A protein has these predicted regions:
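Short strand-loop junctions, especially beta-strand C-caps/beta-turns
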Residues: 3, 40, 187-189, 284-287
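Substrate-binding/active-site clefts of carbohydrate-active enzymes
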Residues: 1-33, 39-177, 201-208, 223
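Generic low-complexity segments that are intrinsically disordered, proline-rich and/or Lys/Arg-biased
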Residues: 11, 259, 283-284
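Short loop/turn segments at strand-loop or loop-helix junctions that form parts
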Residues: 1-3, 39-40, 236-241, 276-281
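Flexible glycine/proline-enriched surface loops and loop-helix/loop-strand junctions
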Residues: 152, 281-283
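Active-site-proximal helices and loops of the catalytic beta/alpha 8
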Residues: 73-82, 91, 169-172, 180-276, ...
């Protein structure tokens, strides 16, 4: 089965869970069978729609409550639709209470699980290390130099067993709510990640529940599909976002040369399908386009 999926950024666009619930009949009539909610937990919406959490286990009060979320999920399932949760176990928001505690414990030399969830250093080892007055040390942030981030998204330390355990708790919590899919933000670049850690801390948790998941930005397609049994792959062969905005579909349309897409389809989409998985490729809304160009882009992506 295939259908369109529509993604919501509730915190960023100030949409409540109840307003999304009220739109379900319209979405169903339009042919959507899956809705995706991005970063609905507590967190500042200013960077990437709020992917950096301040509380991984609570709905952001600006969009509703856990009860509202559970009600929305029931209404989605009552219509034979699916709900996918886009979350993040790679980094948090720098004002998260648990990161502030980690900084305090680092400064005071106190052992704690929160302190061990992050990487601290007395030295600036490279440009991904940012100074914290509170910790009196540098902390690691993989995406800290990205547009708008400015070091405000400290990375979790996957090389630490206490964070691995917390990651499993996080995934279990949202899976227990009954979501149908959990999409993860760029797992290949989690701090300290290895294949074994991914398998134990993420894959086994989701696979034992039969939950759909997606490796955003996956480069080694064969590994993610064949070894980790991912059924949905969101790579960047057809488009790029953030600091590298790119749409191969729009480029081909503007150059009046559809042959430009052949190589991309063979090297990316066809490989994924041959391995038994599905691609997820959204329109590149960050690139301005005419109505005609946007319709062409949408039609092409739907046909993939």
């Amino acid at each position: 089965e295939t259908s369109g999926m529509t993604r919501y950024y509730p915190k960023y666009y100030r949409q409540t869970l109840n307003s999304i619930k009220d739109s379900l009949d319209i979405l169903q009539a339009q042919g959507y069978r899956n809705i995706e909610l991005s970063a609905i937990y507590e967190g500042d919406p200013s960077v990437w729609g709020g992917l950096g959490a301040t509380n991984n286990y609570a709905i952001d009060p600006s969009i509703g409550t856990l009860e509202d979320f559970e009600d929305l999920l029931r209404e989605v399932h009552a219509r034979d639709m699916r709900l996918t949760f886009f979350g993040n176990v790679g980094y948090c928001w720098y004002k998260a209470p648990f990161f502030e505690k980690a900084c305090d414990d680092q400064r005071n030399g106190v052992y704690s699980k929160e302190r061990n969830w992050f990487h601290f250093s007395d030295k600036k080892l490279n440009d991904n290390w940012f100074w914290s007055d509170r910790a009196q040390a540098y902390y690691y942030s993989c995406w800290g130099n990205s547009d708008g981030a400015e070091g405000r998204i400290p990375s979790y330390n996957f090389n630490n067993w206490e964070w691995q355990e917390e990651c499993r708790n996080y995934l279990d919590f949202w899976a227990d709510k009954g979501v149908d899919g959990i999409l993860l933000d760029a797992p290949e670049v989690y701090d300290g990640i290895t294949d074994d850690i991914i398998n134990e801390s993420i894959i086994k948790v989701l696979n034992r529940r039969g939950i759909l998941t997606n490796a955003e930005g996956a480069s080694n397609i064969e590994k993610w599909i064949s070894r980790f049994d991912f059924k949905l792959i969101q790579g960047f062969d057809m488009y790029g976002w953030g600091g590298g905005k790119r749409s191969e579909v729009l480029n081909a349309r503007r150059n009046q040369n559809p042959c430009e897409l052949n190589g991309k389809l063979k090297s990316y989409r066809d490989r994924i399908v041959a391995l038994g998985a599905t691609t997820i490729t959204p329109p590149m809304w960050e690139i301005p386009a005419t109505n005609e160009e946007r319709l062409f882009e949408l039609a092409y992506l739907i046909s993939m």
